[in-house]
């Protein structure tokens, strides 16, 4: 049976998953988790260091372990890494264990939000825009297929996104807030 009390945020880097996730968890009295931060906590090193020493495959393996663990929790909001949806096992855990929200935004908005962040290994390239466009081309169909709801964070504030998520979910017949 699907656990509709967890909320999992998916989407590209810079879409606001961590920011919206923290606000959403606070509004709902739920626990917030960020899969990338949990990977760093468990390994004691940064995501860029994992990419450097283990490559993307090593990082994705660690990410799958963390997602399997975290999605087994109750009443959490989880901000996932942008590429977490690439692994079938991650998609299965997310779909079966909670409500999946796709936070989407334009490549331009992603660039504005991430251009100074050196902790984005996939953007350490000569042409970050082209890289983001490539990632979106591959991942957007996966995000859309997996998502229960899609919320555009490029045109609205984080607080507005939180309100839209809560309203959409409550219209589906389940109350999220703890009274």
UniProtKB/Swiss-Prot annotation:
Enzyme Commission number: 2.7.1.71
Catalytic activity of the protein: shikimate + ATP = 3-phosphoshikimate + ADP + H(+)
Cofactor binding note from Swiss-Prot or TrEMBL: Binds 1 Mg(2+) ion per subunit.
Gene Ontology CC annotations of this record: cytosol
Annotated residues for binding of ATP: 14-19, 120
PROSITE patterns, sorted: SHIKIMATE_KINASE (PS01128)
Alphabetical UniProt keywords: Amino-acid biosynthesis, Aromatic amino acid biosynthesis, ATP-binding, Cytoplasm, Kinase, Magnesium, Metal-binding, Nucleotide-binding, Transferase
Nucleotide-binding keyword on record: yes
Binding-site residues, substrate: 36, 60, 82, 139
InterPro entries (UniProt xref): P-loop_NTPase, Shikimate/glucono_kinase, Shikimate_kinase/TSH1, Shikimate_kinase_CS
Coiled-coil spans in chain: none
GO molecular function, one term: shikimate kinase activity
Entries under PANTHER family matching the protein: SHIKIMATE KINASE, SHIKIMATE KINASE 1, CHLOROPLASTIC
Family the UniProt entry places it in: Belongs to the shikimate kinase family.
Function: Catalyzes the specific phosphorylation of the 3-hydroxyl group of shikimic acid using ATP as a cosubstrate.
Entry protein name: Shikimate kinase
